[in-house]
Amino acid sequence: MKNKLNGIQNYMKNNGIYEVQMLDKFEDNSIKFIEGIDLSTAYSFEITFKKVAYIHCLMSLYEPEFRLATEEEDNEIRKNYGAYPGKTVFIFDVDKDTEYYNKYFVIAEDLDYKTELVFR
């Protein structure tokens, strides 16, 4: 899981990706965040959270850093939002080094990402 998250962060950094948008579809209990020049026709980067149990985030994330929850964060989130056994808490740190810092999260079974052009 950490390798996938590192891959996402490295790809975003190396390709100048600063913002991702959540697709307005929720299919197969999955959510997708995408990035591309013209999202109405195509996108070239996709992060998919699979078998989502709970989501707490905005539709658009600027300068997100995706990571696993710390043990303390995991315990606090599960206490407040549900245990969801077998699922992982993924954290999105947004605007981390600014006064606008926010922390969002998704509780899901897995995640994956693609770096290929997809036409809508």
Predicted segments with their positions:
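Surface-exposed, interaction-prone regions used to assemble/regulate multi-protein complexes
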Residues: 1-120
